[in-house]
Amino acid sequence: MMLGAAKILCGMRERFAGCVKLIFQHSEDTLPGGAKELVEKGVLENPHVDAIYGMHVLPDAHRAGQVGFHIGPITTSVDLFDFTVSGRGGHGSQPQNTTDPVLAAAQMIVMMQQIVARRVDPMEMAVFSLGSIHGGDAPNVIPAEVKFGGVTRAYSESVRSVIKEQVQAIAKGIEAASG
């Protein structure tokens, strides 16, 4: 798409003044993302960038050959999260001798999934997605550790703050309740 845009712009060069700089941002969905690195390396200077327009491929949004246009923000923030829930493993026949990280992680996940539905204004947009969960290898053994992670997305800083505060409160509460 970038090469196509470059070809079109070159073909209409006499119709605009100034300079066009095409920038490919790598790693836009991971933290800290490619934008920070590009800015630090001076991509917005020499020549100075006065305006910037973003483009992203969204294969489900339009049919082949169509382009959509939107003024203002069109994509959300991306906040990745990873948790390691540590406990004391043991045999499943003696759960009283364990501190079960599977149960604690499950409770955290269920409660975190409720954040958007119960703590974010319904007029705002937010997404909380769990992408991975790992713990244990045997069905009759309570593991000592469970790891899970995912991503949250929002348009506003206030919603990002609500989600972050709620995630921390849930983690602390489950930790206190689980021993």
Describe each model-derived feature in a short phrase:
Residues 1-3, 9-143:
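Histidine/acidic-residue-rich, glycine-tolerant segments that coordinate divalent metal ions
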Residues 8, 173-174:
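Alpha-helical scaffold elements within enzyme catalytic domains, especially in hydrolases
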Residues 139-164:
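A conserved active-site cap/scaffold subdomain adjacent to cofactor or substrate pockets
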Residues 162-172:
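Short amphipathic alpha-helices in soluble, non-transmembrane regions
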Residues 175-179:
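Short, intrinsically disordered, charge-balanced linker/junction segments flanking boundaries
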